[in-house]
């Protein structure tokens, strides 16, 4: 994992099953190639952090414990991610839950894809 510095960062959201996560490796790589000069931050579950770390594509991997209530997820995200560092979000999960995170990032006019 590269050194993380505060500059424009790109956040990738990916949860789901193991197979689903593995299928996201190619999109991770494509995003890394497209954003060579930005810090990539992955928001995922603890189970996937080791796999993601081994790719070497992320400057930072942030894990949350997803709860039954989206509000708890949002609190964890706000606590762990400095939203002012994020310039773009790729929501590779595209679920109702991850889509609900959009409002967190919309406050700072962050570009959202997904």
Provide a role label for each language-model segment.
Residues 1-114:
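Catalytic machinery of carbohydrate-active enzymes
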């Amino acid at each position: 994992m590269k050194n993380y510095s505060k500059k424009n960062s790109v956040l990738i959201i990916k949860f789901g099953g193991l197979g689903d996560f593995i299928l996201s490796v190619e999109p991770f790589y494509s995003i890394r190639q497209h954003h060579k000069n930005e810090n990539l931050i992955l928001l995922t579950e603890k189970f996937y952090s080791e796999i993601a770390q081994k790719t070497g594509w992320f400057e930072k991997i942030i894990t949350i414990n997803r709860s039954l209530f989206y509000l708890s997820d949002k609190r964890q995200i706000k606590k762990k991610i400095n939203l002012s560092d994020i310039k773009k979000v790729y929501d590779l999960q595209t679920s109702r839950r991850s889509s609900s995170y959009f409002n967190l990032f919309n406050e700072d006019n962050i570009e959202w894809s997904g």
